[in-house]
C-alpha cells in the first residue's frame, strides 16, 4: 500500500498492537511519525456512475483529511504526555489515536481498492485469489452476496472486509465498527478489500439505501490490487 508518510520525527511503533502494547509503546517512545493524506491514482469523477465525483471529493478531501489531522494532533499530544510522564493523559489519548489512526489506515486501503471501469475496475478476480474465493465461498457471486449482506446488516457505521488469514491461509468476510482497522479482529488478518459503509461514503448519492451502494461499488472494485496483496502475503 503506497501511503505518503511524512516521517518528521522518530517512529512511534503503535497504535494497533495487542492488549497492553499501545501504552508500553508510548512509555518508551522518543518521538512520533505523522502521516499525510495519500494522493488518489484517479480523478474524483473517474468512478462515476458507481460513486459520484462529489462524494469522492468530500470523502477524500474532508473526511480522510480530518482523520489525518486529528491523528497527527493526538500523536503530538501523546509525545508531550509521555515526556511529562502523564500516564492519565496517555490513557485518555488512546481512543483518539485508535479512531483517527484507524480512519487513516482504512481509507488509505479503500482508495487502493477502487479503480475506474476504463482501467479494469470491476473485473472479477483471477489467479490464486480467484481460486481461493471459489474454495472458501463456493463462487465469486457467493462472496459478493455475503459481503453485501454483511455490509447492509452492519448497524451504525463501520466497514466490511474481505480478509486473508495469513496463518490459516483462508479468506473470510469480516466487519469492524466505526474506524476500527481489521487488525483489531485478529493479528493474522490482512485486508484485501474494504468497503466503507459509513453514510458519508454513499448518502449524497444513494440516500439511506445502503444496499444500492453496495451493489454498485463492485463495478469499480480493483481486484488486481487485492490479488497482488494476497499473493505477496503468501509468497
Curated annotation (Swiss-Prot):
- Report the co-factor binding details: Binds 1 Mn(2+) ion per subunit.
Instruction: Please provide, alphabetically and separated by semicolons, the GO molecular function terms listed in this UniProt record.
Output: manganese ion binding; superoxide dismutase activity
> Which example biological process does GO assign this protein?
response to reactive oxygen species
Which GO terms of the cellular component aspect does the record hold?
Answer: mitochondrial matrix; mitochondrion
Q: Known Gene3D superfamilies for this protein?
A: Fe,Mn superoxide dismutase (SOD) domain, Iron/manganese superoxide dismutase, C-terminal domain
Q: What InterPro entries does the record point to?
A: Fe/Mn_Superoxide_Dismutase (IPR050265), Mn/Fe_SOD (IPR001189), Mn/Fe_SOD_BS (IPR019833), Mn/Fe_SOD_C (IPR019832), Mn/Fe_SOD_N (IPR019831), Mn/Fe_SOD_N_sf (IPR036324), SOD_C_sf (IPR036314)
**Lineage: superkingdom:** Eukaryota
Binding sites annotated in the UniProt record for Mn(2+): 59, 107, 196, 200
Q: Give UniProt keywords alphabetically.
A: Manganese, Metal-binding, Mitochondrion, Oxidoreductase, Transit peptide
Q: Is Oxidoreductase tagged as a keyword? A: yes
Q: What does this protein do?
A: Destroys superoxide anion radicals which are normally produced within the cells and which are toxic to biological systems.
What is the name listed in the Swiss-Prot or TrEMBL entry for this protein? Superoxide dismutase [Mn] 3.1, mitochondrial
Amino acid at each position: 500500500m503506497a501511503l505518503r508518510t511524512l516521517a518528521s520525527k522518530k517512529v512511534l511503533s503503535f497504535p494497533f498492537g495487542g492488549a497492553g502494547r499501545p501504552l508500553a509503546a508510548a512509555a518508551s517512545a522518543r518521538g512520533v511519525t505523522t502521516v499525510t493524506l495519500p494522493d488518489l491514482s484517479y480523478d474524483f469523477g473517474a468512478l462515476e456512475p458507481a460513486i459520484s465525483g462529489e462524494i469522492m471529493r468530500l470523502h477524500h478531501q474532508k473526511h480522510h483529511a480530518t482523520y489525518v489531522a486529528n491523528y497527527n494532533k493526538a500523536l503530538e499530544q501523546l509525545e508531550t504526555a509521555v515526556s511529562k510522564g502523564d500516564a492519565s493523559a496517555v490513557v485518555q489519548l488512546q481512543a483518539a489515536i485508535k479512531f483517527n489512526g484507524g480512519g487513516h489506515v482504512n481509507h488509505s486501503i479503500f482508495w487502493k481498492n477502487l479503480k475506474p471501469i476504463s482501467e479494469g475496475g470491476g473485473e472479477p478476480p483471477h489467479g490464486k485469489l480467484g481460486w481461493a474465493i471459489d474454495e472458501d465461498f463456493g463462487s465469486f457471486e457467493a462472496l459478493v452476496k455475503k459481503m453485501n449482506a454483511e455490509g447492509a446488516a452492519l448497524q451504525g457505521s463501520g466497514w466490511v472486509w474481505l480478509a486473508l488469514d495469513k496463518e490459516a491461509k483462508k479468506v473470510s468476510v469480516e466487519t469492524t465498527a466505526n474506524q476500527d482497522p481489521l487488525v483489531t479482529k485478529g493479528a493474522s488478518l490482512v485486508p484485501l478489500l474494504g468497503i466503507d459503509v459509513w453514510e458519508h461514503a454513499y448518502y449524497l448519492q444513494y440516500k439511506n439505501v445502503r444496499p444500492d451502494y453496495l451493489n454498485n461499488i463492485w463495478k469499480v472494485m480493483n481486484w488486481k490490487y487485492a490479488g497482488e496483496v494476497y499473493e505477496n502475503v503468501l509468497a
